[in-house]
């Protein structure tokens, strides 16, 4: 039986990645909806993108009412802005919440109905073009066909999926991660570690995902402590951005396992940051599956020099 491997159409990474992607972004449409959050507006991070759009003569509207654990109500409000402003493509600037929100808004803009309607279904209708610019090194959402949105009526986190949710362009520019505080750096970095290690020990692992997962694990162990101690270290931030991207590619194709399966309800019920809930479960979950993936855990240990 063969394997399928899905990635964004184009990936720009490293220093000045946004600038390198500028000409491509300008071809995606006439007016962008920039999906972001209040902190990215306050820090001026979103302005880095809107300045580029101004330079390229691309019109845009901004929807910045995204908070952690985005909800179906936020998606509905964002869709209203998208339609009212006659936008035809989307750019997300932020952590996993704005990127997941962008995907959900894009999906409903073409599929219709409410995002809640797609729980348990594969989203298949093509979306408008999407650009994902992460400001944390962890979620990997810029390289996945998944989005997680909270259903406010049922108080559950919905895992929604479909290849059409894969962003067309992923931009991992370390300049966007320099303002992440220590707490966010640690939590999102551990999220990336869980993505990579779960993908590597998954029954769905394949040769290509193995390469991405092991590369990510090695980078995370080397560079996450550096980023935590010195958030202004551009090289370390660049390597962590790349590691998060690699981990996202790995789990997008190999899936995550027991850690993420158990952490999702914790986040929904107690609103614990996603990376923290994963970290809380990591030791217990991997102890539980250790015997079934002994050789795989040995491989990971060798990669980090244990």
What is the predicted function of each stretch?
Residues 138, 245-275:
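Glycine-rich phosphate/pyrophosphate-binding beta-alpha loops
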Residues 73-175:
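Glycine/threonine-rich beta-strand-loop-alpha-helix active-site module
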